[in-house]
Design a protein with these regions (language model features):
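Thiamine diphosphate
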Residues: 1-146, 295-296, 302-526, 531-533, ...
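Conserved beta-strand elements of the Class I
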Residues: 149, 373, 561-563
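Residue-level marker for buried hydrophobic side chains located in beta-strands
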Residues: 150-151, 179, 375, 616
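Glycine-rich anion-binding loop/nest that anchors nucleotide
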Residues: 153, 433-434, 564, 590
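Short acidic, Gly/Ser-rich segments with clustered Asp/Glu that frequently serve as metal-coordination loops
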Residues: 155-161
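Non-catalytic, alpha-helical, charged scaffold/linker segments
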Residues: 277-308
């Protein structure tokens, strides 16, 4: 056990570095970082197990930060670990720095998740805890004996997502999840008492958490709480640590600057900064220093960790020799490579809804991909993720041998937990709900896109053909929103999200194959509620791999090109016979993914959608959904929704809203006559 004075000195060292980073950048959040320094120091210098020489070791404990604005605390602690240099943290919030304002996924530097939007980080941590339990059930305790640590703030507790995480983690009994709640009673605009009057401990106890309340700035109490959390074998643990915002901060006039809203989101300021650094034992002229006793503290921990890791790796080697088949599976699962799937085993029925076609694909994935988890937000029998569920069973407290995650009605929680499963490694995650409820998931979709996490988002009931449920449940603008993400690149130059909306059952199989092959970005799969007619005989569905392609039966040298995705492709086909009877040569293009199409060679794009040929687009979403393919101007026309939907049987809505072959004929004839 390390000397308390050394531990307190190390925490003060973190405070000095954190405050100095913010001061130098003239931007950031020093107060919370200073309050949380004691906990992060105890965790990193005495409890967190990791390999100092291999940050990617699968057996490592994971630490997930939820309040990304507390990055100065995390960067400072990681600097003491040796993962960042002093020069690195001096460049906090600057162009090209490895220390951005909010942490971004960087496992080599010890950062397990991008964080910032409050609440999502601890949902990600809960997902990682599920992944560890899932893998333990398949590989055993030797390979999966690590813990998931998470750090949350008052803001995360206030966010609605905390309800979902609290409920799910408690229900599943995630005893490998240890969460520290930095309860400093201060937020950006007010003290928390002005906006939150609740018994948080009682709330989490009601969710069946092990709740421990401590002084979060007291080393002995932090240690005792962590020991208790590690010993817990039935429940997730919440350590509520009462901390002091801006601990150790001193104003320019020499009075205390602790417990002040002003230190939350702004530099301390010249006089206060100088007095604070002096008060904490640092030199304002040379603040970016690691104290000698703190260097020794972390050097000793590194040596201790080398011994711990060596012993663990010896256990792992012995396990691998005794379980060569499982070792091979584990290597495959953690490789990040796409799984091998025999798609020929998927037998599709003609004319079914694409959600049913997706169900057939999911059934095979459940059989062929043993490290895949599928989830649904209380809609498995409707979004047809039950195709997967029928081949396995749901995850339950004490039984993680199943592979289906019933998240309940909590779309954002589900999405972020699936991200966490994949960030943990070894697991492929997919999650489903109605397309209109993708709105609840947008923050998670954005984080997955930013981090390049290849979660599979399954969205069904894709248009006004939801029918009788009416406009609250009928997506109109959602497709345009998600397809915009295909136009946004991540920092690696990839389309941030890959979107597929297949035209029939067989095209669905190809889209699912591409989704499983996509290991670099999230994939959105958009499926219909209603049955869809099969595309013309002889259609080459493998051409869907190019994002957009010419449907079988199209005419050479067309007078007009008809473009759509999803069920609207068959509606276009329904209008073609009458157009051809009038002597009009027609090409039909199915475009399940505009983003993928725009990644094709220019020659292919021009061959499918030649610039000088008139184009007519049909979409059950906003007209702008197809503007990137059909264009705008006199040679282009798009027929789409101008309002929200209505409540009526979907076939009635098709007639009333003009989504029929007859109206396609009428619209195209009128378009060509001008």
């Amino acid at each position: 056990m390390n000397d308390i004075q050394v531990m307190n000195h190390a925490a003060d060292n973190i405070r000095i570095l954190a405050a100095s980073m913010v001061e130098k950048a003239n931007s950031g959040h020093p107060g919370g970082a200073m309050g949380g320094a004691d906990f992060i120091n105890v965790l990193f210098s005495e409890y967190l197990v990791y390999d100092p020489e291999d940050p990617t070791w699968t057996g490592r404990d994971r630490f997930y930060l939820d309040p990304g604005h507390m990055s100065p605390m995390l960067y400072s602690a990681l600097t003491l670990q040796g993962k960042f240099s002093i020069e690195d943290i001096k460049q906090f919030r600057q162009w090209g720095s490895p220390c951005p304002g909010h942490p971004e996924l960087d496992v080599m530097h010890g950062i397990e998740n991008s964080s910032g939007p409050l609440g999502q980080g601890h949902a990600i941590a809960a997902g990682a805890a599920v992944a560890e339990k899932f893998l333990e059930a398949r590989l055993g305790k030797v390979m999966m004996q690590h813990r998931i640590f998470c750090y949350i703030s008052d803001g995360a507790v206030e966010e609605e997502i905390s309800q979902g995480v609290g409920r799910v983690a408690g229900t599943l009994g995630l005893d490998n999840l240890i969460m520290f709640y930095d309860a400093n009673d201060i937020q950006l605009s007010t003290e928390t008492k002005d906006v939150m009057d609740e018994d948080t401990a009682a709330k989490y106890r009601a969710w069946h958490w092990n709740v421990i309340e401590i002084n979060g700035n007291d080393v002995a109490e932090i240690r005792k709480a962590l020991d208790s959390a590690i010993a817990e074998s039935e429940r997730p643990t919440l350590i509520i640590g009462k901390t002091i915002m801006g601990r150790g901060a001193v104003k320019a006039d020499g009075t205390s600057y602790e417990h002040s809203v002003k230190t939350h989101g702004a530099p301390l300021g010249d006089g206060a900064y100088i007095n604070t650094i002096k008060h904490l034992g640092g030199d304002p002229e040379n603040p970016f220093v690691i104290f000698d006793d703190v260097k020794k503290l972390y050097a000793d921990r590194r040596e201790e960790l080398k011994k711990i890791v060596a012993a663990r790796r010896a256990e792992e080697k012995k396990w691998a020799e005794a379980n060569p088949d499982k070792k091979q599976l584990m290597d495959e699962w953690f490789s990040g490579k796409a799984p091998k799937v025999d798609w020929s085993k998927v037998q599709q029925k003609e004319g079914v809804a694409t959600r049913a076609a997706s169900s057939a694909c999911l059934a095979e994935l459940a059989k062929q991909v043993p490290n895949m988890i599928c989830a649904s937000a209380d809609l498995s029998n409707s979004d047809k993720t039950d195709g997967f569920l029928k081949q396995t069973h749901a995850l339950k407290k004490g039984d993680f041998t199943g592979a289906f995650f019933q998240a309940g009605v909590a779309e954002l929680t589900m999405a972020d937990m699936c991200i966490g499963m994949m960030l943990h490694g070894g697991v492929i995650a997919a999650c489903g709900t109605f397309f209109v409820f993708s709105d609840y998931m947008k923050p998670a979709i954005r984080l997955a896109a930013l981090m390049g996490v290849p979660v599979k988002f399954i969205w069904t009931h894709d248009a006004f053909r939801v029918g009788e449920d009416g406009p609250t449940h009928e997506p109109v603008e959602q497709e345009a929103q998600i397809r915009l993400m295909e136009k946004l690149q991540n920092h690696k130059g990839k389309d941030s999200v890959r979107v597929f909306r297949p035209a029939d059952a067989d095209e669905t199989t190809v889209c699912w194959a591409m989704a499983m092959e996509n290991t670099e970005t999230p994939t959105a799969l958009i499926f219909s509620r209603q049955g869809i007619a099969k595309l013309p005989e002889g259609n080459d569905y493998e051409q869907a791999r190019k994002g957009a392609y010419i449907v079988a039966g199209s005419d050479e040298n067309p007078d007009v090109i008809l473009v759509a995705s999803g069920s609207e492709v068959s509606t276009l086909e329904a209008g073609c016979a009458a157009l051809r009877a009038d002597g009009i040569k027609v090409r039909v293009v199915s475009a399940p993914s505009e983003g993928l199409f725009r990644r094709q060679p220019k020659e292919y794009q021009e061959a499918v959608l030649p610039y000088n040929v008139k184009k007519f687009g049909l979409t059950a979403g906003l007209p702008c959904t197809l503007e990137g393919l059909v264009g705008i101007g006199p040679n282009s026309r798009i027929y789409g929704m101008k309002s929200f939907g209505f409540s009526a049987p979907y076939k009635v809505l098709d007639e009333k809203l003009g989504y029929t072959g007859d109206n396609v004929y009428k619209q195209v004839k009128e378009f060509l006559s001008k």
